Amino acid sequence: MSERKIINDPVFGFINIPKGLLYNIVCHPLLQRLTRIKQLGLSSAVYPGAQHTRFQHSLGAFYLMSEAISHLTTKGNFIFDSEAEAVQAAILLHDIGHGPFSHVLENTLVTGVSHEEISLMLMERINKDLKGQLNLAIQIFKDEYPKKFLHQLVSGQLDMDRLDYLRRDSFYTGVTEGNIGSARIIKMLDVKDDHLVVESKGIYSIENFLTSRRLMYWQVYLHKTSVRSEE
């Protein structure tokens, strides 16, 4: 029996999903629901190619998380296998709370509660199905785990969420400004006092990342036609 599932991703190529907890998460109906939710909501009104889904984004973020854990480990940062699996689970589930049309729903039907809060509720529901196997992942997601850098990899200024969605949204919209060097940025990451840091030689890559993110907001996320469609 195969010990992993291989998924071919248009952005990063082959993504390996190990059998066990992570594979069970990918197959769970609540995560599979994201295969029917567009990553960019109504942005396809402007960029017809923007048909990619939250599920694809979750897989891409998982791939980058796997790369980040590998690189941090080679730099002498000790990460238990259980911690690696937990932070991978957390990034797979980080967007599970998104509803139809993505952020549009937060401003219409569901008000007063963020998709992050809904994500946490659904993670706890899945945790019951998996008999507590997500306890550590939920701790990391809620930033209640001592190794703060693990949460920062899931939700922070240089998290794997942002590194994926900029690359992915750039790919599917055709807006090349978002095509950041995610591999280079990940290689420049390190840990100091349990917090995520960047090596000095990676500063230029971070500057490019911040510029790319700003340009993507101008050209894609806050495009006047997309915003009007969502209103």
Positions of PLM-derived features:
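Sequence-structural signature of the catalytic-core scaffold of metal-dependent phosphohydrolases
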Residues: 1-38, 45-89, 97-231
